């Protein structure tokens, strides 16, 4: 892309997802902001901004994926540095918002950590948050600053449309994901099915029943996050057992922790389509996994925010 040409737009990256950050700046046509994110000898974060940002719209790109605590602390310190350097606005771009699954008190005496993270970002000095497919949309209400939540479904829909799959059914792996599945199904002009599951303890899922017709069909399971891959692989195996012709799976955020890769390798999933909101280690880039880039979407959102244009067109 040609140079954007506005010196008042500054984009900086921290350590969690540099590949995506550089894709975004290349897409916009601006150089990456000059800064260093290092550690003191005792492990404390040291940040230095190496250019003037006075009066600029600053965008900080950082997924708060594992190690989540390290990446959150980097982001908070960077926000403080930018604020003290007299930036006009501090726009925090968080492709993957860590701690989003801790959005409510599931049991007595539990914290609501997603709200705590929101408080920390605001207190540090963030003036806007730009993110993608929050695990719980109500997290937007945890902030008293603007939150732009972009959607990954159009990217996934375009990918599957180009594959030209026949007789598709879109599957939600649980009742909570029905709205997401419906959005993909509407774009693919396909019916939906639902996996009715019971989760006896965290990261352990048991498939109980399938609601909807899947026999002889090509199933596409969609979720927002795949962590240990227990839910998605059990769902895929159950779909095949109930007569699905083949099974694809997709998600926005590939956490892929613990036994996830082995489970995916050994599952009935033909292809897992993910996005690059989280940078995957080399050993996780197996043949079954296809990665799509969110850089064009996020670059467009950044430019629109900077130019005070509407971002709502990017929400659907």
Curated annotation (Swiss-Prot):
- Any one Pfam family match given in the protein's UniProt record, by short name: Pribosyltran_N
Q: What is its EC number?
A: 2.7.6.1
Disulfide bond positions: none
- Residues that coordinate or bind ATP: 42-44, 101-102
- The keyword Cell inner membrane appears for this protein: no
Any idea which positions bind Mg(2+) 1? 135
From which domain of life does this come? Bacteria
Q: Does the keyword Transcription apply?
A: no
* Cellular component, GO annotation: cytoplasm; ribose phosphate diphosphokinase complex
Question: For D-ribose 5-phosphate, which residues are the binding ones?
Answer: 199, 223, 227-231
Write one Gene Ontology MF term: magnesium ion binding
Which terms are listed as keywords in the entry?
ATP-binding, Cytoplasm, Kinase, Magnesium, Metal-binding, Nucleotide biosynthesis, Nucleotide-binding, Transferase
The annotated subunit structure for this chain is: Homohexamer.
What family name appears in the similarity comment? Answer: Belongs to the ribose-phosphate pyrophosphokinase family. Class I subfamily.
Extract the PANTHER family matched here.
Answer: RIBOSE-PHOSPHATE DIPHOSPHOKINASE FAMILY MEMBER, RIBOSE-PHOSPHATE PYROPHOSPHOKINASE 1, CHLOROPLASTIC
Function summary: Involved in the biosynthesis of the central metabolite phospho-alpha-D-ribosyl-1-pyrophosphate (PRPP) via the transfer of pyrophosphoryl group from ATP to 1-hydroxyl of ribose-5-phosphate (Rib-5-P).
Protein name (database record)? Ribose-phosphate pyrophosphokinase
Taxonomic classification, please?
Bacteria, Bacillati, Bacillota, Bacilli, Bacillales
């Amino acid at each position: 892309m040609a140079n954007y040409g506005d010196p008042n737009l500054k984009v900086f990256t921290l350590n969690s997802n540099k590949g995506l950050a550089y894709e975004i700046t290349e897409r916009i046509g601006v150089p990456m902001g000059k800064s260093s994110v290092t550690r003191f000898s005792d492990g404390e974060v040291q940040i230095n901004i190496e250019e003037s940002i006075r009066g600029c719209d600053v965008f900080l790109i950082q997924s708060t994926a594992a190690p989540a605590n390290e990446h959150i602390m980097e982001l908070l310190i960077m926000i403080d540095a930018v604020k003290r350097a007299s930036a006009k606005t501090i726009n925090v771009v968080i492709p993957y918002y860590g701690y989003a699954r801790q959005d409510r008190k599931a049991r007595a005496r539990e914290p609501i950590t997603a709200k705590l993270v929101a408080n920390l970002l605001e207190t540090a000095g963030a003036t806007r948050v730009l993110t993608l497919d929050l695990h719980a949309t109500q997290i937007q209400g945890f902030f008293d600053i603007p939150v732009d939540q972009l959607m990954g479904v159009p990217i996934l829909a375009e990918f599957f449309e180009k594959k030209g799959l026949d007789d598709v059914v879109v599957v939600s792996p649980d009742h909570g994901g029905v709205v997401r599945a419906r959005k993909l199904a509407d774009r693919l002009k396909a019916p939906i099915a639902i996996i009715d599951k019971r989760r006896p303890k965290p990261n352990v899922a048991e498939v109980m029943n399938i609601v909807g017709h899947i026999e002889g069909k090509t199933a596409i399971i969609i979720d927002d996050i795949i962590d240990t891959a227990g839910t998605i692989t059990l769902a895929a195996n159950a779909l095949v057992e109930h007569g699905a012709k083949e099974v694809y799976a997709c998600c926005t955020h590939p956490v892929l922790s613990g036994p996830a890769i082995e489970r995916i390798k050994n599952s009935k999933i033909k292809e897992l389509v993910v996005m690059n909101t989280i940078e995957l280690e080399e050993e996780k880039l197996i043949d079954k996994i296809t990665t799509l880039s969110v850089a064009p979407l996020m670059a467009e959102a950044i430019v629109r925010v900077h130019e005070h244009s509407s971002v709502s067109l990017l929400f659907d």
